[in-house]
């Protein structure tokens, strides 16, 4: 209980000790916040009464009041409620942990919850802060709560590759790599995806759905990134202007590519014909492109083509969904009823001819796009463009076996695995 203040002498002045109510540190901790406020307000009123009486020692009274208020506020800050049951978590035995990923927790290390509960129990038992700091090696409770706990890191261990994770959900995602689990399958082409969102985006190729519509025109797109790229065409400001024809561009690389069309520099001449091209990949077309005269003929309309792929694509123009022009009788695609083009080898569909033609190089194993720096070939022009960026950057990581360089250590480690497989 609170100790009684000393009895004042009848003739002496009224001092702070005559009015103050004293509490021990343990009693202050157990006080309700309203009781601490009442004690502090009562002490303050008593001191104000003493000051009004004109007694000596007013500076000492104010100093004592300030110290008393600070002590109560500090104790109020150090008071923490118990946020979990005061029961220690039992250690999981090896029999109970069979088949349970949580049993992979490192043995001999207390969990974070148990450490916090131990701290709260110590506070509730009114252990002085000095003893508490000596026990945990810190000075204040704020340092205890804010200090990182090394035992909480990498406590979930993968049984396949011994890799550690700090959260069980990360371990579950990682284990799909070993099992090869891909549970989202397309019902049209049979392609499998790891995530439902990727399957939903892929399904738009078959359904022709384009949910992202431009607010300034009637164009629509399957992906939001395509819409964002399209919106740049509506921007009026085009800071880069061609000095020859006055055409404006939003990006400097686009202007540089356009200016090649006005000059004879960096042009490539075909060995099969007299045509010139601004880009070298155009020279890598199949030889049948330059053969004089059409080589492939369609069976229904007797129309001739230079490449064998186009007669198969021409089937789309003879179905019932095509519309006939009233002037000259030619058939055209009805884009309102247009169905995506399907690859005859893998049943994948594409919205336009150019994408399907580029895709065909994957099945024919043709690699017409060749890198000028390292002479590596690629099936798609986009793959070549992505590869050429690697030559622009520094590659400080060098393979000691073949001498090939890489821009990151991760790529070097992945490359070294090919040498290990070849030796085995």
UniProtKB/Swiss-Prot annotation:
- Enumerate the SMART domains for this protein: KRAB, ZnF_C2H2
Q: What is this protein called?
A: Zinc finger protein 597
What organism is this sequence from? Homo sapiens
PROSITE patterns (alphabetical)? ZINC_FINGER_C2H2_1, ZINC_FINGER_C2H2_2
The record's subcellular location field reads: Nucleus
Q: What does this protein do?
A: May be involved in transcriptional regulation.
Gene induction? Imprinted. Promoter methylation of the paternal allele may restrict expression to the maternal allele in leukocytes.
Q: Where is the KRAB domain?
A: 14-88
Molecular function terms from GO: DNA-binding transcription activator activity, RNA polymerase II-specific; RNA polymerase II cis-regulatory region sequence-specific DNA binding; sequence-specific double-stranded DNA binding; zinc ion binding
CDD domains per UniProt:
KRAB_A-box
Please name the gene that encodes this protein: ZNF597
InterPro entries for the chain: KRAB, KRAB_dom_sf, Znf_C2H2_sf, Znf_C2H2_type
Locate the coiled-coil region(s) and give their ranges.
Answer: none
